[in-house]
């Protein structure tokens, strides 16, 4: 199914009962919606939530912005535009207010959603993310190098690129190259936009600090981070929780910048508990 934000088409899928409260899941840089695995979505749905996952613009089956005009800072769009995409998906399914959870860049997007339209955000969960302030944007050199590599267009090279990245920033205890390769192959074979990650990264860098907006938020906020994250150090999550009034910070020991199945249960318990405590 598709939603529309102007000329931008956004592919989305839903799980669970549409009569239940809605949880919108927002992906990170270059990540397709299928990385919120159906089984993981099912765990949330079993807790009484309608779950919505979608491809951000410039990834998967949503619109490509290759060749789009750039602003003065070299960005084809901003995080604000991507936040509007999230609301467009909610509009398409007839939902006025939703709980939102975003990972990495997705965390930045849900922060922007809550800042711009707090009346539509019931609760926010920002995971492995940060505030847009330069001093809290800390990555290992190797992680940054791997993240900024041009997307491979050959299938085997793309799979190896995925594996190399997770070997650097994945959760060490649950490293599983066979699972990583299967996930990478699934994303590559699904097709759609290739090369949008660089444009998404430009949007992140162009959008600046959200500190003032986060300080003013009244949306109930949960912040989750792992202490083994080498793409966005936990100081980014701690800073987010520090800025948002009454935010709760949860550190998951041993977790990197990924979401292995062994941690899904913990994650669902945290998010569902946050939603229920604020409903």
Task: Give the ranges of each region predicted by the language model.
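Flexible "cap/lid" loop of the alpha/beta hydrolase fold
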Residues: 115, 123-153
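Active-site loop/oxyanion-hole signature of alpha/beta-hydrolase fold enzymes
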Residues: 59-101
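Alpha/beta-hydrolase
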Residues: 141-212, 219, 239
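Gly/Ala-rich beta-loop-alpha elbow adjacent to hydrolase catalytic centers
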Residues: 102, 106, 110
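Conserved HGGG/HGGXW glycine-rich cap/lid loop of the alpha/beta-hydrolase fold
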Residues: 8-68
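Catalytic active-site module of serine/aspartate enzymes centered on a nucleophile-bearing elbow/loop
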Residues: 247-279
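Short beta-strand/loop motif that positions the catalytic acidic residue
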Residues: 217, 223-225
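Acidic catalytic loop of the alpha/beta-hydrolase fold
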Residues: 228-232
């Amino acid at each position: 199914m598709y939603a529309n934000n102007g000329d931008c088409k956004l592919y989305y899928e839903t799980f669970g009962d549409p009569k239940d409260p809605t949880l919108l899941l927002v992906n990170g840089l270059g990540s397709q919606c299928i990385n919120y695995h159906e089984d993981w979505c099912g765990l949330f749905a079993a807790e009484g939530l309608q779950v919505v996952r979608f491809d951000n613009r410039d990834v998967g089956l949503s619109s490509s912005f290759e060749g789009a005009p750039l602003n003065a800072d070299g960005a084809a769009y901003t995080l604000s535009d991507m936040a509007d995409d999230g609301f467009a998906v909610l509009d398409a399914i007839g939902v006025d207010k939703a709980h939102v959870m975003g990972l990495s860049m997705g965390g930045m997007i849900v922060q922007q959603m809550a800042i711009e339209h707090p009346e539509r955000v019931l609760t926010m969960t920002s995971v492995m993310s940060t505030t847009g302030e330069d001093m809290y944007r800390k990555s290992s050199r190797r992680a940054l190098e791997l993240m900024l590599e041009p997307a491979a267009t050959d299938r085997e090279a793309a799979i190896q690129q995925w594996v190399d990245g997770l070997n650097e920033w994945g959760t060490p205890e649950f490293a599983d190259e066979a699972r990583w390769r299967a996930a990478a192959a699934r994303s590559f074979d699904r097709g759609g936009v290739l090369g949008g990650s660089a444009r998404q990264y430009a949007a992140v860098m162009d959008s600046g600090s959200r500190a003032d907006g986060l300080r003013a938020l009244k949306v109930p906020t949960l912040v989750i981070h792992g202490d083994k994250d080498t793409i966005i150090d936990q100081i980014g999550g701690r800073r987010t929780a520090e800025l948002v009034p009454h935010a709760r910070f949860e550190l998951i020991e041993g977790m990197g910048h990924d979401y292995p199945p062994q941690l899904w249960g913990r994650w669902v318990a945290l998010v569902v508990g946050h939603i229920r405590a604020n409903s």
